Amino acid sequence: MSTFSAKPAEVVHEWFVIDATDKVLGRVASEVALRLRGKHKAIYTPHVDTGDFIVIINASKLKVTGTKSLDKVYYRHSGYPGGITATNFRDLQAKHPGRALEKAVKGMLPKGPLGYAMIKKLKVYGGAEHPHTAQQPKALEI
């Protein structure tokens, strides 16, 4: 008997919605990364995108433990000399709710074409509303 290998046409991608209110950033990110990769499914195949679509609402209400809201720093660089900017978690959440969660999940996914396809299945919204009701996402508790 040979090893099972999922075919891309046979994979069913389900939709899930996660309410991130008062959840810890890293715990949500690790569970989301696992589900985007499809490792929770019995048909998981490393070279095939077997993951599900994840919609995260209330990302503006995410928490971090300890003093990380001030100590955790996110860096960007414009490409010009001296063009580095630093932003802490609190300021990033105030300006772009959900950006910290997107960066955390992206760091947990594989790099390359398959990983880039996986991150496109993540939809993050700062408020309680999302435009994906037509897909009938199931509630997922973390």
Curated annotation (Swiss-Prot):
A GO CC term assigned to this protein in UniProt: cytosolic large ribosomal subunit
A biological process term (GO) from this entry: translation
Keywords: Ribonucleoprotein, Ribosomal protein
Entry keyword DNA-binding: no
Gene Ontology MF term list: mRNA binding; structural constituent of ribosome
Family: Belongs to the universal ribosomal protein uL13 family.
NCBIfam families according to UniProt: rplM_bact (TIGR01066)
Summary of subunit composition and partner proteins: Part of the 50S ribosomal subunit.
Function: This protein is one of the early assembly proteins of the 50S ribosomal subunit, although it is not seen to bind rRNA by itself. It is important during the early stages of 50S assembly.
Protein name: Large ribosomal subunit protein uL13
Organism the protein comes from: Paracidovorax citrulli (strain AAC00-1) (Acidovorax citrulli)
Lineage summary: Bacteria, Pseudomonadati, Pseudomonadota, Betaproteobacteria, Burkholderiales
